[in-house]
Amino acid sequence: MAEQLNSLEELGTVAKTEAAAPVHVQKLDAQGRAYATGKRKDAVARVWVKPGTGKITVNDKEFEKYFARPVLQMILQQPIVASNRAGQFDIVATVAGGGLSGQAGAVRHGISKALTYYEPGLRTVLKKGGFLTRDSRVVERKKYGKAKARRSFQFSKR
């Protein structure tokens, strides 16, 4: 603390002057879009959100074509459904690295962050759903003297 305290009464006045929680403001670029990056495993997604008809494009393809499995499509739409904003935003994403599952998670993370930048009021809903938290689980590295990260080579007693 910068100030020196001489008595307990002064401590009470200093504690009351603490700043309030930060107010989140809308962050848009020159075209009126919200931009965010999402990450999952080795995948990194760059996501732009703007008002529109609900069209989602991933790497210049419709998301139904890029993510053919219904589970991955559902993962992608979770933040939009949770915030009741289906059909209100056009989403453009470019994603690279990792496999399809990691890429779907990265796009979901990016969509969630971009929605909060566009509409800060959605932050509580998306935070409660766990969409704003970066899933930090990555593949454990292989160790020498082992077949994989934890799997040992076959042991022969004799």
UniProtKB/Swiss-Prot annotation:
Question: Molecular function terms in GO for this entry?
Answer: RNA binding; structural constituent of ribosome
Q: Give the family per the record.
A: Belongs to the universal ribosomal protein uS9 family.
User: What do the Gene Ontology cellular component annotations say?
Assistant: cytosolic small ribosomal subunit
Keywords from the UniProt entry:
Ribonucleoprotein, Ribosomal protein
Query: Which lineage?
Result: Bacteria, Pseudomonadati, Pseudomonadota, Alphaproteobacteria, Hyphomicrobiales
Tell me the HAMAP family matching this sequence: Ribosomal_uS9_B
Q: Which NCBIfam families match?
A: PRK00132.1
One Pfam family from the UniProt entry? Ribosomal_S9
Protein's UniProt name: Small ribosomal subunit protein uS9
UniProt key word Transcription? no
One GO BP annotation here? translation
InterPro entries found in the cross-reference section: Ribosomal_Su5_D2-typ_SF (IPR020568), Ribosomal_uS9 (IPR000754), Ribosomal_uS9_bac/plastid (IPR023035), Ribosomal_uS9_CS (IPR020574), Ribsml_uS5_D2-typ_fold_subgr (IPR014721)
